[in-house]
């Protein structure tokens, strides 16, 4: 594009900006006519037009490119001719404003009357493009926004409103006058952003003059004005573009999500309909005058069988007895619906739910389980209708407060239904939600690439132009010089632009006044000058001034002094010292806590003074040493000085109230660590990089939040005020409401955090369901799912390799390493010296120096390298060469001496100038290569970590003996020594044998030989597969045994005894296994394998507890806690299961980087934690009335002392919130709760209510403390938690690179072929079900196998689902009957389908899985009809099976071309399944271990908050349920709360637990906190994020696959069509049927008729009998789609081999000819025929004429016989024309039967079908076709014709 547009450029420079005149317009019209004529000509001659595009750098809105120079003032704001060649024949003109921005207008009259030359339009244009105009509009919008945030605006705001409307109207009028309304391009309504303005203004006028009822709803439309900011700020448009793109891309995911949710909701509806209304109702009713026998009859209500029957309480016949009961004035309905009769738990708003199955919740004494009252949460949580079920499942999928739904459902329906939730969380939540992330990330990446490509293009264009201009300039110079020589005068060039020796422009000369120059030269030099200046940040005078003021070189002694100080300040040791000070300072700040002694407080404040002094001194010294000019050139120094200044200011203002926040700024010093901690540095960089891009996104997010907050306030604010009594018992506004803007903003922010359901219930209760659902779900989908995922996408994209390169700006980066290197060197020096002394020889200093090498990278005299050397950046390109060299060296490809960089690598610590790159996802090597990723593939330090090899080796695990390979031996050696690989290794390492020679055993004789035989026997046993299987079985059994040790074990004596014995048996077996392995493998191998170490430690635990039992110490505390470590037993299973081991190895590879990020996150959080301690320590205490659990008002109790004075009553307590900020540790816990959004509400409420230390809190007195949490959530939660995902994904990619992705060495082209072929090879033609011989059966068969039949059945299935969706819990009898009848119809239809298929397909019906499934469903449906009551009572409702039928939709999707996107998503899921299964297994293992641990530690804690009778750690099942809940971090705060009770009055340590001898119900806070935090980090952050990583990865792969021209389905469709043409699955097809076959195929393989010629050109090989093989056809068609390529043949060969191997039954496949040869043969034959015919004709004509002449001469003598002869001959020649076709077809048949490869010579005429190819007989013979055996070039068609 660039090159094409260059020649058409007018030589740039300001002079080419020509005013737009009527002549210009006429010229445009002239050009347009010429262009039209040219196009017409081209069209007639069928010449293709290259597509023309507008130039990207001259788009409207962009700035005028530099090449055009500075436009002179007279062209500013004036219509100019368009510069873009694209518009040369279109009626447009441009206008430039002062900022050189381009505005493009249409040159047609605006509003039909204002031509481009009219005064009015010119004025309007001037106003429109003026910077002040847009500024004014922007300010108006912002002011308007401020007015919109007022919850109750003053009376005069109406007038202001009119003003705003006036301004917007004026703006639109200006635009219309300048641009025109909507007819041509560049008019007002052609810009979608103007639609927004137009609609807003129209709405304003409509609402003003027409009364439309609900004004506030319409007024909310004004909020959209805030969107106008997007039009004014340039960067925002692109982000919004990306957003809109991603929303478009999301359509498929949305459809899939809605579909899956509908299916799940349907299942939920069928399973749990009406369950959530089951409550505990007081029973029997407390009445005196009722007939006692009526309710006291035991058999009637107390009987389990009765109350286990669901149908009883809904039974109409029973209710019909009301009339009888009402005699005794008992109103059943009222009783059942009176909330006073329900059982409520303390502090809950909803009655306790219960269920009638054995594993559901039970009611307390005196209550019965009945269906009564409304559903929980104002009646909004239920499965009673499809829509509520859908909402419940959407909530489950977005994981908002789902633990509540989970607990309610399990309580009402039973714990078995946990499976339902597992499926939905894993499929719905993890998969679908992350697909949304994957799609958004991809859309963003694509958008990004496009932008980059555009920039690249511009850059290239610009470079080309500069080249041209330079040449031009040189030519001018030459011309001038020549002139000067000729004329003898001076060539007086332009003085300001003399070039200095470096070839750069010297801009120091004074500029004259700008003269309007017409030479291109000045434009170029101006442009160049601008470029130069653009590279300098400040104007030149600033540099002069800075040199004078900021560089202090006054006198020689001072300079010397400066140099000394520089040496001191820059010394690595000083750096080390400063770093230590930073760490100590951070520690001091982290030691603050509450309550703190005065002495400790003093120590801390003195410490702070000292550190402030040290840092100030460092800054002052650096300023002296480096001069302010140099000092402030470095970012770190600016940062330092900022913090030091703040610290000093804070000291000065220490006693001013309210400025304690300044103390928090000291915390930023922590970030100075980044200087010497590469990972931290890099993470800060990543965040910095993202913040740039995120700046715009954050603005968009802010605009969205603002709009929704205002909308919420306008729509619902009033309702909250008026209907507040519905949601608050004391009729005061709750904390979360929308009455004012700030609270409305908080609600929207909370929705962005993913918590929308609770606030939505409130909203629905006060303001109606429809509006609230709409607004909340819009915020949820737009804000949370799209914008926040875009956030994540940005972060992930910042993880690109560029940001991972650690910064090399300053040499100081390594100062720490240098210092540490020196210290190591010093220690080594001392060691060597002392050893020398001990050995009695005193080494000279020189010797020691020689033996140790240089001290840690210092120069000769131990000083650090001089400053200038240090700062010099490494040469960029040179580096690259060195890098390549380095790689070659590693692989051994370069000979000659080692490259210097290699030596550097070896002399690693000693090189001070080396920047060490520590990528975030570092490889596992301890030493990083000095080069970046290029060397990763050849990572050298592998051998350094040999001993631990098995851990990282995917297959070898000694302890999983199945694949034991003795390590550390060369494969060749090994092969020589023991051919079977079945000999044990050495027992001990060489070092051991050297130290203790007694360990050496001679195995060739005597005892040694016996020992060797024993070892070999053990080795054989251990290596045997059965042994391995047995051990795995034992591990599983012993792990399973642990699950029985719950709180009931004491009561189950038999089980307990069995377990005790089993435990001993297991221990003995494992000890035996360990001893066997010691003997078999030897200590050396056993103890160098990490998996064996794991086994060893776990067996040790068992041994210790066994010994303790023998000695009778089993009740000792330490022994008991050791016993809990038995929970680790299942870990031994890890090494035995391949799938899990793969995942664990991947995880272990990621651990270093995960730890790195975890550390950095901790540092990040430390800042917020210390800040929290500063803000809230000791302020969360409150005074509470223990009887009512209510907090006293501050009017009653104001502070701690007042509270303590009331304590004598015993009902008052001064207590703290359990999770608080009293010290940094608790601060961390609080932050974790806030970051996972669990339990964060209580912490936030406490913070917002807090006043001062030891003062009673007051409601929302400290409202803006919410902002602390908002900021933390953005930086601490969004950023840092998402970094985990980034790291894990990055790591996955690194590991893939390391373990050799095979695709790395393939070109894109090759990959395409490779993939197509991969798919191709896996398929082969199936034998179709034969068509029945019977006529009727045959007809039915045809009907049943049609696609239409399938699709119509599918539609019926969907309709059946719809009728199931219509069901509700409280439907009328009529509806029940109608649905029953409809259901009957469906059952009959599906039964009919079943019968028809069985009739047509006969016994083959049962060979297809889907058919069997259908059959079972039909049978179940019929049985279900007959026995519905019975089945519903004891089994799952049979309607459920119908839901599974929906899976058949997947089959129909193939037939719909448009559903490709959805199929891609499903394909991604299928690809991820194996990996996800492995991760699921690992997750289960972790859950298992933790639940065993939880049972042994928390079984007896007090039941409160999240722990109750169903959700607890008492039994294994309950523990698993609790842990599954926490896997998504849901509800962990509730489970942790009771465990934080450490003593009275929170819990009772002496409480008796019946049935056991364990006392107390207190928890252990430290164990509890470790337990939950570690579980959350492992499961939530690591395992769940691995899920995300895999899905992202596979989604990308699947998208690539689906975007390939040929996908799996195309091949499947090919074979499906093939089956119809080859019913016997011979894999061959007749050549005659080929044309029909390729015509019936689906796109893209299809070749539509007429396709004869096309098929001939495909050159397909044929076997005897004129048959063609399926693979050949498929290859040819694939080639046709993908285009030809050199790799094709090789691939084809491998594919054929594969196919032969897969199908040994294949017929001997020896092609004898090809379609092309066959055609050539036919053509040859026809030509020979024709030639021969002509020859005959000519002969007979000759003969005839001869005869004629002869007869003339002979006077007719003998004519008759000759006539006969002649007639005969003529007939022979021409008679055949009549039976042309007959002969031809016969000839063809004969030819078909011949198997001769040579050309046929029988004489037949051409067939009609070939006439197209053969010229009519009279024409001269065509050039002969090539002889046999010679190939024809690709253009066969031409040669044939």
Curated annotation (Swiss-Prot):
IV repeats: 1329-1627
Regulation: The channel is inhibited by tetrodotoxin.
Transmembrane segments: 132-150, 158-178, 193-210, 217-233, 253-272, 418-438, 573-591, 603-622, 637-656, 659-676, 693-711, 773-791, 1027-1044, 1058-1076, 1091-1109, 1118-1136, 1154-1173, 1264-1285, 1349-1366, 1378-1396, 1409-1426, 1440-1456, 1476-1493, 1569-1591
Reactions this protein catalyses: Na(+)(in) = Na(+)(out)
Keywords in alphabetical order: Cell membrane, Disulfide bond, Glycoprotein, Ion channel, Ion transport, Membrane, Phosphoprotein, Repeat, Sodium, Sodium channel, Sodium transport, Transmembrane, Transmembrane helix, Transport, Voltage-gated channel
Amino acid composition bias (Acidic residues), ranges on this chain: 925-941, 969-983
Effect in UniProt of substituting residue 663 to F: Homozygous mice are born at the expected Mendelian rate and have no visible phenotype. Hind-limb muscles show decreased excitability and decreased force when K(+) levels are low (in vivo)
Residues bearing glycans: 214, 288, 291, 297, 303, 315, 327, 356, 1185, 1199
Name assigned to this protein: Sodium channel protein type 4 subunit alpha
Source species: Mus musculus (Mouse)
Taxonomic placement: Eukaryota, Metazoa, Chordata, Craniata, Vertebrata
């Amino acid at each position: 594009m660039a090159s094409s547009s260059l020649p058409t450029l007018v030589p740039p420079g300001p002079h080419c900006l020509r005013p737009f005149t009527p002549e210009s317009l006429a010229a445009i019209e002239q050009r347009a006519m010429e262009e039209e004529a040219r196009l017409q000509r081209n069209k007639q001659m069928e010449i293709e037009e290259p597509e023309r595009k507008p130039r990207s750098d001259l788009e409207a809105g962009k700035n005028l490119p530099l090449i055009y120079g500075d436009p002179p003032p007279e062209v500013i704001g004036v219509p100019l001719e368009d510069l873009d060649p694209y518009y040369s024949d279109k009626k447009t003109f441009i206008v430039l404003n002062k900022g050189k921005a381009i505005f493009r207008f249409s040159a047609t009259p605006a509003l039909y009357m204002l031509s481009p030359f009219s005064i009015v339009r010119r004025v309007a244009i001037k106003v429109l493009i003026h910077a002040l105009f847009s500024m004014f509009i922007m300010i108006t919008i912002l002011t308007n926004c401020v007015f919109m945030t007022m919850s109750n605006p003053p009376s005069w705001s109406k007038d202001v409103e009119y003003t705003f409307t006036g301004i917007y109207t004026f703006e639109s009028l200006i635009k219309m006058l300048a641009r025109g309304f909507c007819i041509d391009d560049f008019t007002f309504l052609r810009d979608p952003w103007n639609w927004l303005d137009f609609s807003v203004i129209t709405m304003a006028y409509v609402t003003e003059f027409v009364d439309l009822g609900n004004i506030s709803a319409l007024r909310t439309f004004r909020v959209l004005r805030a969107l106008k900011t997007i039009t004014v700020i340039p960067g925002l448009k692109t982000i919004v573009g990306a957003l809109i793109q991603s929303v478009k891309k999301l359509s498929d995911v949305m459809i899939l999500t809605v579909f899956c949710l509908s299916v799940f909701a349907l299942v939920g509806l069928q399973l749990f309909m009406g369950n959530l209304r089951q409550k505990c109702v007081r029973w029997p009713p407390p009445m005196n005058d009722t007939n006692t026998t009526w309710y006291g009859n035991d058999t009637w209500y107390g009987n389990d069988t009765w109350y286990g029957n669901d149908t009883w309480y809904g039974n109409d016949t029973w209710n019909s007895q009301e009339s009888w009961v009402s005699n005794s004035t008992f109103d059943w309905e009222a009783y059942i619906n009176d909330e006073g009769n329900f059982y409520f738990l303390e502090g809950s708003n909803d009655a306790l739910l219960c269920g009638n199955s054995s594993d559901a919740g039970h009611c307390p004494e005196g209550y019965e389980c009945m269906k009564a009252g409304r559903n929980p949460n104002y009646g909004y949580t239920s499965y009673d209708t499809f829509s509520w079920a859908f909402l419940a499942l959407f909530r489950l999928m977005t994981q908002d407060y789902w633990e509540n739904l989970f607990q309610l459902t399990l309580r009402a329906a039973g714990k078995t239904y946990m499976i339902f939730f597992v499926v939905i969380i894993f499929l719905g939540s993890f998969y679908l939600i992350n697909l949304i992330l994957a799609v958004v990330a991809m859309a963003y990446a694509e958008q990004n690439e496009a932008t980059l490509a555009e920039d690249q293009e511009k850059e290239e264009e610009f470079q080309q132009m500069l080249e041209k201009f330079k040449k031009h300039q040189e030519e001018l110079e030459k011309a001038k010089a020549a002139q000067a020589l000729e004329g003898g005068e001076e060539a007086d060039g332009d003085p300001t632009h003399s070039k200095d020796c470096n070839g750069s422009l010297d801009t120091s000369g004074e500029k004259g006044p700008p003269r309007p120059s017409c030479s291109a030269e000045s434009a170029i030099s101006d442009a160049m000058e601008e470029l130069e200046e653009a590279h300098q940040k400040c104007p030149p005078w600033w540099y002069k001034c800075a040199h004078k003021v900021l560089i202090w070189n006054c006198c020689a002694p001072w300079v010397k002094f400066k140099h000394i100080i520089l040496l001191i300040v820059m010394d690595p040791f000083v750096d080390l010292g400063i770093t230590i000070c930073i760490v100590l300072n951070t520690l001091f700040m982290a030691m603050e806590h509450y309550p703190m002694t005065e002495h400790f407080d003093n120590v801390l404040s003195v410490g702070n003074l000292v550190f402030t002094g040290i840092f100030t001194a460092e800054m002052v010294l650096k300023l002296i040493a480096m001069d302010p000019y140099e000092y402030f050139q470095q970012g770190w120094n600016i940062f330092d000085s900022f913090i030091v200044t703040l610290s000093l200011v804070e000291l000065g203002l220490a006693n001013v109230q309210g400025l304690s926040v300044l103390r928090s700024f000291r915390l930023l010093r922590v970030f100075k660590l980044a200087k010497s901690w590469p990972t931290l540095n890099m993470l800060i960089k990543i965040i910095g990089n993202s913040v740039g891009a995120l700046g715009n996104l954050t603005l968009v997010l802010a605009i969205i939040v603002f709009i929704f907050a205002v909308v919420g306030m306008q729509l619902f604010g009033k309702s909250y005020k008026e209907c507040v009594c519905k949601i608050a018992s004391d009729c005061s506004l709750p904390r979360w409401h929308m009455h004012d803007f700030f609270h409305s903003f908080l609600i929207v922010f909370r929705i962005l955090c993913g918590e929308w359901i609770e606030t939505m219930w409130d909203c629905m209760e006060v303001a109606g369901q429809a509006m609230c659902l709409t607004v909340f779900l819009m915020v949820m989908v737009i804000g949370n799912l799209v914008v926040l995922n875009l956030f994540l996408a940005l972060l992930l994209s910042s993880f690109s390799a560029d940001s991972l390169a650690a910064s090399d700006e300053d040499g100081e980066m390594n100062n720490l390493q240098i210092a540490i290197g020196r210290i190591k060197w010093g220690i080594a020096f001392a060691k060597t010296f002392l050893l020398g002394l001990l050995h009695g020889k005193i080494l000279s200093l020189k010797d020691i120096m020689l033996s140790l090498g240089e001290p840690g990278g210092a120069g000769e005299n131990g000083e650090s390298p001089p400053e200038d050397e240090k700062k010099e950046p490494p040469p960029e390109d040179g580096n690259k060469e060195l890098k390549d060299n380095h790689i070659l060296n590693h692989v051994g490809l370069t000979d000659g001496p080692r490259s210097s960089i290699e030596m550097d690598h070896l002399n690693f610590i000693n090189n001070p100038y080396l920047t060490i790159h520590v990528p975030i996802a570092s490889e596992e090597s301890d030493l990083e290569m000095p080069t970046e990723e290029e060397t990763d593939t050849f990572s050298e330090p592998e051998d350094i970590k040999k001993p631990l090899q098995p851990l990282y080796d995917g297959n070898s695990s000694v302890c999983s003996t199945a694949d034991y390979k003795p390590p550390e031996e060369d494969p060749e050696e090994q092969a020589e020594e023991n051919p079977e690989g079945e000999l044990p290794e050495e027992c001990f390492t060489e070092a051991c044998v050297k130290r203790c020679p007694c360990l050496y055993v001679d195995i060739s004789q005597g005892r040694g030989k016996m020992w060797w035989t024993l070892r070999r026997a053990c080795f054989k046993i251990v290596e045997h597969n059965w042994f391995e299987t047995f051990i795995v079985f034992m591990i599983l059994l012993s792990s399973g045994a642990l699950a029985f040790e719950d709180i009931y074990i004491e009561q189950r004596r038999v089980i307990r005894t069995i377990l005790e014995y089993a435990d001993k048996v297991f221990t003995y077996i494992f000890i035996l296994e360990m001893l066997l392995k010691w003997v078999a493998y030897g200590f050396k191998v056993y103890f160098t394998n990490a998996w064996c170490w794991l086994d060893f430690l776990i067996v040790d635990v068992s041994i210790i507890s066994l010994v303790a039992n023998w000695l009778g110490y089993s009740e000792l505390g330490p022994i008991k806690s050791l016993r809990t470590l038995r929970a680790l037993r299942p870990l031994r299973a890890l090494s035995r299961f391949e799938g899990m081991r793969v995942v664990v190895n991947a995880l272990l590879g990621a651990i270093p980087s995960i730890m790195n990020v975890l550390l950095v996150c901790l540092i990040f959080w430390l800042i917020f934690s210390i800040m929290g301690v500063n803000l809230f320590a000791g302020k969360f205490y409150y005074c509470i009335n223990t009887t009512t659990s209510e907090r006293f008002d501050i009017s009653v109790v104001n502070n701690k002392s007042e509270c303590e004075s009331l304590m004598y009553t015993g009902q008052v307590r001064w207590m703290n919130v359990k999770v608080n900020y009293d010290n940094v540790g608790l601060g961390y816990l609080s932050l974790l709760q806030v970051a996972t959004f669990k339990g964060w509400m209580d912490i936030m409420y406490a913070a917002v209510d807090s006043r001062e230390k030891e003062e009673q809190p007051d409601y929302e007195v400290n409202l803006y403390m919410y902002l602390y949490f908002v900021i933390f959530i953005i930086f601490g939660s969004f950023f840092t938690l998402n970094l985990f995902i980034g790291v894990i994904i990055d790591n996955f990619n690194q590991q893939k690179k390391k373990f050799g992705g095979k695709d790395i060495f393939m070109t894109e082209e090759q990959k395409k072929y490779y993939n197509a072929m991969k798919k191709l090879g896996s398929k082969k033609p199936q034998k179709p079900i034969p068509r029945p011989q019977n006529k009727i059966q045959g007809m039915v068969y045809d009907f049943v196998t049609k696609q239409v039949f399938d699709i119509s059945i599918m539609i019926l299935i969907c309709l059946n689902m719809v009728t199931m969706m219509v069901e509700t819990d409280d439907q009328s009898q009529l509806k029940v009957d109608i649905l029953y009848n409809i259901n009957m119809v469906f059952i009959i239809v599906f039964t009919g389908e079943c019968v028809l298929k069985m009739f047509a397909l006969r016994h083959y019906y049962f060979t297809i899985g889907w058919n069997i499934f259908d059959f079972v469903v039909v049978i179940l449906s019929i049985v279900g009809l007959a026995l519905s009551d019975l089945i519903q009572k004891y089994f799952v409702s049979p309607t459920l099976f119908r839901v599974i039928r929906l899976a058949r939709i997947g089959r129909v999707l193939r037939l719909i071309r448009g559903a490709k996107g959805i199929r891609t998503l499903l394909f991604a899921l299928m690809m991820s399944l194996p990996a996800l299964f492995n991760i699921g297994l690992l997750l289960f293992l972790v859950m298992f271990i933790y639940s065993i641990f939880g049972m042994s530690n928390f079984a007896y804690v007090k039941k409160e908050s999240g722990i109750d009778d169903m959700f607890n750690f008492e039994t294994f099942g309950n523990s698993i349920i609790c842990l599954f809940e926490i896997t998504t971090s849901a509800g962990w705060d509730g489970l942790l709360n009771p465990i934080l009770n450490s003593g009275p009055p929170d819990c009772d340590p002496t409480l008796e637990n019946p049935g056991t001898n364990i006392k107390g119900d207190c928890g252990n806070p430290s164990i509890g906190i470790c337990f939950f935090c570690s579980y959350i980090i492992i499961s939530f952050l690591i395992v769940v994020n691995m899920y995300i990583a895999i899905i992202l990865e596979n989604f990308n792969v699947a998208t690539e696959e689906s975007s390939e021209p040929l996908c799996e389905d195309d091949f499947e469709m090919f074979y499906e069509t093939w089956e119809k043409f080859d019913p016997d699955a011979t894999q061959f097809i007749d050549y005659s049927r080929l044309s029909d076959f390729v015509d019936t195929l689906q796109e893209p393989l299809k070749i539509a008729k007429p396709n004869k010629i096309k098929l001939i050109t495909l050159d397909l090989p044929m076997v005897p009998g004129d048959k063609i093989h399926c693979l050949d056809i498929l290859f040819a068609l694939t080639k046709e789609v993908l285009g030809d390529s050199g790799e094709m043949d090789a691939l084809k060969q491998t594919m054929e081999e594969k196919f032969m191997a897969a199908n040994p039954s294949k017929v001997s496949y020896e092609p004898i000819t090809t379609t092309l040869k066959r055609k050539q043969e036919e053509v040859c034959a026809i030509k020979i025929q024709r030639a021969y015919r002509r020859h005959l004709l000519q002969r007979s004509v000759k003969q005839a004429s001869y005869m004629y002449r002869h007869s003339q001469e002979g006077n007719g003598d003998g004519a008759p016989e000759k006539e006969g002869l002649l007639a005969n001959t003529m007939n022979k020649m021409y008679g055949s024309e009549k039976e042309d076709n007959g002969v031809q077809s016969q000839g063809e048949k004969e030819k078909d039967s011949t198997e001769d490869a040579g050309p046929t010579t029988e004489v037949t005429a051409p067939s009609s079908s070939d006439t197209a190819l053969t010229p009519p007989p009279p024409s001269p013979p065509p050039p002969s076709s090539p002889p046999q055996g010679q190939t024809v070039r690709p253009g066969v068609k031409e040669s044939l014709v």
